[in-house]
Amino acid sequence: MKKQNLIEMEGVVTESLPNAMFRVYLDNGCEVLAHISGKIRRNYIRILLADRVKVELSPYDLTKGRITYRLRTKSNG
């Protein structure tokens, strides 16, 4: 169930951190710290550097987010 008040943006993974955390550079020029959502974790979807991802941001803290989807690129099928 998707929450209504979340901000969804696209970006590129720039750094992989411990505990399934990633630094994501968003299309608007901001950089956020994001963790993986439960569905991605459960389905063993790998997030690598330079992957394009969709990130949900809370309107209360725009520096942290949740990666909800890894977008397809030409190189990964």
UniProtKB/Swiss-Prot annotation:
Residues annotated as domain S1-like: 1-72
Gene Ontology cellular component terms for the protein in this record: chloroplast; cytosol
Gene3D superfamilies attached to this UniProt entry: Nucleic acid-binding proteins
Disulfide topology: none
SUPFAM superfamilies cross-referenced by the UniProt entry: Nucleic acid-binding proteins
Keyword check for Repressor: no
Cited Pfam families: eIF-1a
GO function term, MF aspect, one: translation initiation factor activity
PROSITE patterns assigned to the protein according to its UniProt record, in alphabetical order: S1_IF1_TYPE
Taxonomy, superkingdom: Eukaryota
SMART domains from the UniProt entry: S1 (SM00316)
Intracellular or extracellular location(s): Plastid, Chloroplast
Keywords tagged on the record: Chloroplast, Initiation factor, Plastid, Protein biosynthesis, RNA-binding, rRNA-binding
CDD domains assigned to the protein according to its UniProt record, in alphabetical order: S1_IF1
Function: One of the essential components for the initiation of protein synthesis. Stabilizes the binding of IF-2 and IF-3 on the 30S subunit to which N-formylmethionyl-tRNA(fMet) subsequently binds. Helps modulate mRNA selection, yielding the 30S pre-initiation complex (PIC). Upon addition of the 50S ribosomal subunit IF-1, IF-2 and IF-3 are released leaving the mature 70S translation initiation complex.
Family: Belongs to the IF-1 family.
Entries under NCBIfam families matching the protein: infA
Subunit organization: Component of the 30S ribosomal translation pre-initiation complex which assembles on the 30S ribosome in the order IF-2 and IF-3, IF-1 and N-formylmethionyl-tRNA(fMet); mRNA recruitment can occur at any time during PIC assembly.
Protein name in UniProt: Translation initiation factor IF-1, chloroplastic
Gene: infA
